[in-house]
């Protein structure tokens, strides 16, 4: 459930993966 609050500053590298998961 990281996409719920998508903390970009918490993990920038995961931010790109999180965006792809949110699109799905």
From Swiss-Prot:
Region Disordered: start and end of each range?
Answer: 1-24
- Ribosomal protein: present as a keyword of the record? yes
* Basic residues biased stretches: 11-24
Please list the GO terms describing molecular function. rRNA binding; structural constituent of ribosome
Record carries keyword Transit peptide: no
Please list the GO biological process terms of this entry: translation
In terms of domain of life, where is this protein from? Answer: Bacteria
Alphabetical GO CC annotations of the entry are:
ribonucleoprotein complex; ribosome
**InterPro entries (UniProt xref):** Ribosomal_uS19_SF
Name the keywords, alphabetized: Ribonucleoprotein, Ribosomal protein, RNA-binding, rRNA-binding
- Role description: Protein S19 forms a complex with S13 that binds strongly to the 16S ribosomal RNA.
Say which family it is in: Belongs to the universal ribosomal protein uS19 family.
Q: What is this protein called?
A: Small ribosomal subunit protein uS19
Natural source organism: Phytoplasma sp. (strain STRAWB2)
């Amino acid at each position: 459930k990281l996409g719920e609050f998508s903390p970009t500053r918490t993990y920038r590298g995961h931010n790109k993966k999180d965006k792809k998961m949110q699109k799905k």
